[in-house]
Amino acid sequence: NESKETIEKEDFVKRNSAIYEGIEAKNINIKIIDYEEESLTVKYNTAFDTVAGKVDFKNEVAFLEQDDQYKMVWSNSVIYPGLTEDDKVRVSVIQAQRGQILDRNGRMLAGKGVASSVGIIPGKLENRKKSIVRIAKLLGIKPEDIEKELTAKWVKEDSFVPIKKIAKVKELDLLALDPDETIVEEQKRQEKLLKISGVMISDVEVREYPLKDEAAHLVGYVQNVTAEDLEKHAGEGYTNASVIGKTGLEGVYEKELKGENGCKIYIADSEGKEKEQLAYKIVKDGKDIKLTIDADLQAQLYKNFKSDKSCSIAMNPFTGEVLAMVSTPSYDTNAFIMGMSKKQWDRLNKDKKQPLYNRFRQVWCPGSTFKPVIAAIGLQSEAFTGTDNFGNEGHSWQKDKTWGTYHVTTLHTYSPVILKNALIYSDNIYFAKAALKIGTEEMERSLSMLGFHSSIPFEIMMAESKFSNNKHIQSEVGLADTGYGQGQVLVNPLHLACIYTSFCNDGNVLKPYLLYKENAKAEQWISEAFSKSVSQEVLEGIKSVVNDSHGTGYAIHRKDMILAGKTGTAEIKESQSDTTGTELGWFAVMTPDKKNKKPILIVSMVEDVKGIGGSGYVVKKDKAVLDKWFGKN
């Protein structure tokens, strides 16, 4: 009865529940140690797991005999020895520092940065309505959004109420001889904000992406956790204050980057001072992720293609290290960290060029960049030899009348019609015939062996390359079209780059990877895809594409080294007679010499190259990248 007078049943349940739920108590085990019959005292041991680790303590409680029943003499100390009515059990979370994402040279791609937090002190805000409208206009948000923040329950007259994060203007950037115009404009905006009474701008720690647009699709970004995230990742250490990787490598390496929050459970007195620590879990900061990516190359590829709808993959052709992964157009990932307005989001989301679309993860019609692959399959299967003359058919050819009005066309005639020349002149007719000689069964078997209709063993999930919509080439015309990279063939650019590694690695297709390793060594994805002699013969052919003056890739040839490569222009149209279709321009280029000090393989694809030079447009762009990579020849 005395216990009931001390605390109501509802309050008893509420206090106990609040404590045990707050510390996330699990696996509760209470064991009686001793019982003193004379004093009716029970000694017991309590043990349970919490968010901060194991709690284990001894305690005792007295009982009274009333109405032939034993009843507990309850007090707060039953919950924990020494706990009083005014004490609180508190949980303090120590947030783990998120790991950095670094390039191969230690340059930060994602990590700790500083932004400016624009806030308002309500008590100092003069002409409230007009000031809020002006602040909203300068920040690109709605006045009602500001009002919502200012009327939150916790806000007092002297509170600093954060409204929006914006880019921090660094003095060094302003002192440059020719400061960036956007930085100057940002400085002017902040000066206007500070002239409004009650506005303050302070530094705030944020996740920063120094390469901005240049690596957005690769690195990705984090955002504050949502209720859905907390539900989905329950028990994984996320709190309302956590961020989580949403896209790109921020998402792929979320587990490694996030670390483990530290936690302390303690008893606080009525003034909030710590009386006793019950449990403590040490904070474990997230791991840094070092990539094979070269930030300078990543930036250079982006700058050269930023006005196009394109994607580029760069690799070391002898190790499988991925040096760059670029998709354009792009977006500044920092905008997601600062907080994007609906207007900004709509503009980004409705842009016809689709800057949010990650093109390097997709599959595309490869056009003539597929011809070296067909050449290797034909030689490997002994369907033909490199010296077999396929005969000069002019600019148009069909196998027989069963093809109806369908003809394969090509741009150039030459002699003799052998493999090396067919690669130099990018002869569609030669490779259509080559595909027919290979045959449907062998073509499907070989392409399946090369990873078509299978996933690429890579950290980032890529769309699967395919040679047909249903894993079977349906017709003779479809087979012929496959020979020059048309028909239903769709290839992921990383996959194509991997297949090209076989031409300078004795026929072995290398496995691509992103995590940096000291003294990198190649790992084979597909061993002996082609024989050494076959890969060498194809390599000589694609060397000629770049180094023979008639070659479609001759514009990129260099005097200081030998390059190998293949151009491609893929037609995207409804029928052979369609003149309104678009074209994809491709170029694959690499350094085939293992002695080269800066080995590189680049595969680039640009949409809508019709009327601007086809694949030649891409060759010029990649030439500028290689000139920067090697130093102009």
Give the residues covered by each predicted segment.
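Short beta-strand segments enriched in hydrophobic/aromatic residues
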Residues: Y44-F48, V222, F503-C504, T591-P592, ...
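Extracytoplasmic/periplasmic proteins that interact with beta-lactams or build/remodel peptidoglycan
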Residues: K14-C311, Y331-P355, V363
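Membrane-interface anchoring segments and C-terminal beta-barrel signals
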Residues: W586-D593, A624-L626, K632-N633
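Beta-lactam-recognizing serine transpeptidase/beta-lactamase-like catalytic domain environment
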Residues: A268-A279, P317-S368, V373-S604, G614
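Core segments of small alpha/beta cavity-forming domains
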Residues: N1-I19
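A short acidic/glycine-rich loop-to-helix N-cap element
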Residues: E607-K620
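Solvent-exposed, polar/charged alpha-helical surfaces in well-ordered, non-transmembrane soluble domains
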Residues: K14, K129-K137, E191, A216, ...
